[in-house]
């Protein structure tokens, strides 16, 4: 029997982190007089997120077991021309899952931050930002209308700007946060157009009301064109997702977001911001199901991102950037699943990925602490014996990432690969190849990172930059060069994230994908897009799936990539340099990130500046100021000078003027009566 959730309890979920953010951001900083210290600041923000997590967990239980649902408007902001602008919550299986993921990962990041940022001058400000980030994401996922979705969408973009540029005295951080902000504005332009078209043609911003008119929208085309309205709407919405979820070619901001502190890298990449685009497309599934063109576009973009962003992870030497490029690749996998109409598989991978990606980022931060802020993996090695907790949790996260059977990533990633294999849409063949090849690439760069950091010869004493801190330096200064394990406040979140990274897939795949957990939230036309039905026929339980996975191509591709990484970096460490020399053009292409940054900076940015300069000098200075503004007063001055000469004071001049006037009038009347 379906039950109704409490509006007051749901309202407390986003408001509790907001209250903590306001307390730390106002009372804990110079803005509010520093009334509260560090301990109270982090205690209040952690308490707020803890309250949100507890209520979210209770909500998930009510939704999953008791069948509870909630879809109500809490406040009507305004009504303009029949278009209602409201604040409300929609809580179903998709929302409840996202609420738990966001709040749990955020809670782990908050606790971790106590140890990681302990000596940073902006300690209280950072806690305020990450709590505000959590509030923004919760408002986004809990919304029941597109206006509130958009406000949450923009809020996570704004707070990510503040967090990426948290160390605002660093030029690279300021460049990175501006880059993220501008690239996301490109995507948001498409997002706004999509929402605007829905509002214009459906007459509503409410999800349920708009989806009820989906069939009507599917029959509309733009006047004078053969373009289906729903296709244009879906592509516009997906352009927004391309920016927020860093899909090709709007992916360029995400690697540079590593300029922010490691805790926020984990939060952005695991549970907030980049997952917003995936969530939004899944939420809009009733619209996307009406356009095969849009779905194919989504699938191909995701496939390109999954494979080609993975290649870039192979050559990275910064420990955080390797993990960042793995995020880009995994987001591509989720996007491919969306394009195959396997929306539930996409959000399932979103959930599993959130745990092991947060784990890998926080483990990377732990290594950075232990290595006294050396982030170059070429100058690590042998760290396992110095940092046992970080080592074992990193290994578990890596095994989950590459899709090892029984680990969380296996169940979601293999489901994506099977869904694409069963898809009949245009582009599915390329996407299937891309996600299969991506398995090998992911395993290779993941274990390259693992072996270079935790195994092999100790190289940290050979680091030529040993006395200089990496870009994630926030005030810690190690006097000894030997690595050391991080404090418990850092390692406990690693352990707590490692647990779901191992077991969450086995525990939840059946109810989430085949038990109807998302039945009220996600719509799939199984007659046109039967991939999920085919997966259901093939599924015989998580244990059987793991056994079958041992014989499937993804497992052997992952094993091959792992073994190759072991051979190249443990057995024959001279081989990578030889391969680099042999394929220098390929390395140069990858090292320059396919020249996207060069193109954006030298063609788009410089071209825009040149166009702006030309319009300024030619249009503004010469045409507007020169011809219109200055030209008008010059013309008036010239006419005034001519007229002034006629006012001479001589009577015969005025008589002459009168005669000319009479002659002109007579001529006019004669012509008029001819």
Regions found by a protein language model. Give the residues of each.
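Hydrophobic transmembrane alpha-helices and their helix-loop junctions in integral membrane proteins
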Residues: 108-152, 158-480, 506
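Transmembrane helix-loop-helix hairpins at membrane boundaries of multipass inner-membrane proteins
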Residues: 1-11, 15, 27-128, 201-225, ...
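Transmembrane helix-loop junctions and nearby membrane-interface residues
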Residues: 25, 29, 56-67, 107, ...
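Hydrophobic alpha-helical membrane-insertion segments
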Residues: 47-63, 187-200, 394-402, 493-516, ...
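Alpha-helical transmembrane segments and their helix-start/interface "positive-inside/aromatic belt" motifs
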Residues: 36-51, 178-190, 385-395, 450, ...
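Membrane-interfacial helical/loop segments at transmembrane boundaries in membrane proteins
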Residues: 69-84, 206-222, 412-423, 511-544
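Membrane-entry segments of alpha-helical transmembrane domains in multi-pass membrane proteins
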Residues: 2-16, 36-47, 83-101, 139-152, ...
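Aromatic-capped, Gly/Pro-kinked transmembrane alpha-helices
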Residues: 82, 87-90, 510-556, 566-674
């Amino acid at each position: 029997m379906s039950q109704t959730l409490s509006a007051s309890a749901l309202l407390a979920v986003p408001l509790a982190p907001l209250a903590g953010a306001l307390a730390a951001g106002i009372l804990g900083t110079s803005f509010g007089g520093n009334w509260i210290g560090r301990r109270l600041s982090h205690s209040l923000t952690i308490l707020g997120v803890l309250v949100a997590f507890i209520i979210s967990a209770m909500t998930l239980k009510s939704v999953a077991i008791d069948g509870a649902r909630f879809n109500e408007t809490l406040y009507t902001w305004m009504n303009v021309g029949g278009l209602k602008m409201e604040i409300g919550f929609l809580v179903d299986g998709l929302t409840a899952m996202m609420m738990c993921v966001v709040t749990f990962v955020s809670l782990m990041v908050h606790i971790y931050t106590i140890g990681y940022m302990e000596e940073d001058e902006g300690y209280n400000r950072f806690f305020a930002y990450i709590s505000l980030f959590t509030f923004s994401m919760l408002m986004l996922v809990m919304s029941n209308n597109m206006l509130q979705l958009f406000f949450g969408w923009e809020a996570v973009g704004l707070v990510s700007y503040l967090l990426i540029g948290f160390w605002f005295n660093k030029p690279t951080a300021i460049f990175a946060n501006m880059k993220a902000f501008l690239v996301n504005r490109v995507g948001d332009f498409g997002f706004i157009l999509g929402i605007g078209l829905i509002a214009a043609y459906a007459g509503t911003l409410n999800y349920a009301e708009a989806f009820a008119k989906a069939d009507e929208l599917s029959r509309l085309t733009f006047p004078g064109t053969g373009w289906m309205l729903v296709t244009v709407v879906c592509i516009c919405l997906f352009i927004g997702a391309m920016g927020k979820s860093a899909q090709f070619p709007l992916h360029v901001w995400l690697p540079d977001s590593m300029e922010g502190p490691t805790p926020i890298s984990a939060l952005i990449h695991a549970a907030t911001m980049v997952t917003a685009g995936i969530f939004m497309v899944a939420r809009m599934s009733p619209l996307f199901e009406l356009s095969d063109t849009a779905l194919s576009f989504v699938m191909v973009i995701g496939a390109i991102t999954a494979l080609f962003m993975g290649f870039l992870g192979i050559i990275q030497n910064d420990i955080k950037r390797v993990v960042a490029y793995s995020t880009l690749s995994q987001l591509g996998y989720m996007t491919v699943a969306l394009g195959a109409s396997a929306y539930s598989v996409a959000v399932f991978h979103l959930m599993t990925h959130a745990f092991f990606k947060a784990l890998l980022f926080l483990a990377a931060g732990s290594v950075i602490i232990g290595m006294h802020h050396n982030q170059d993996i070429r100058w690590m090695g042998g760290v396992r014996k110095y940092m046992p907790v970080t080592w074992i949790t990193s290994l578990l996260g890596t095994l989950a990432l590459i899709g090892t059977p029984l680990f969380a990533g296996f169940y979601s990633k293999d489901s994506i690969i099977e869904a694409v294999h069963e898809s009949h849409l245009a582009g599915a063949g390329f996407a299937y190849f891309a996600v299969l090849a991506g398995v090998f690439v992911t395993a290779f760069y993941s274990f390259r990172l693992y072996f270079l950091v935790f195994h092999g010869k100790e190289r940290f004493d050979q680091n030529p930059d040993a006395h200089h801190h990496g870009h994630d330096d926030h005030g810690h200064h190690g006097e000894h060069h030997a690595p050391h394990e991080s404090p418990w406040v850092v390692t406990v979140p690693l352990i707590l994230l490692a647990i779901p990274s191992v077991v969450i897939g086995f525990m939840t795949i059946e109810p989430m994908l085949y038990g109807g957990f998302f039945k009220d939230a996600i719509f799939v036309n199984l007659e046109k897009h039967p991939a999920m039905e085919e997966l259901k026929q093939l599924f015989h339980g998580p244990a059987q799936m793991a056994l079958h996975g041992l014989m499937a191509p993804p497992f052997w591709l992952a094993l091959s990539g792992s073994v190759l990484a072991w051979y190249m970096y443990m057995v024959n460490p001279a081989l990578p340099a030889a391969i680099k020399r042999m394929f220098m053009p390929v390395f140069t292409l990858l090292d320059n990130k396919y020249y996207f940054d060069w193109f954006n900076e030298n063609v788009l940015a410089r071209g825009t500046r040149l166009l702006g300069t030309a319009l300024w000098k030619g249009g503004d200075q010469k045409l507007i100021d020169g011809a219109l503004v200055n030209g008008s007063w010059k013309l008036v001055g010239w006419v005034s000078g001519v007229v002034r000469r006629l006012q001479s004071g001589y009577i015969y001049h005025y008589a002459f003027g009168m005669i000319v006037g009479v002659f002109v009038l007579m001529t006019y009347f004669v012509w008029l009566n001819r």
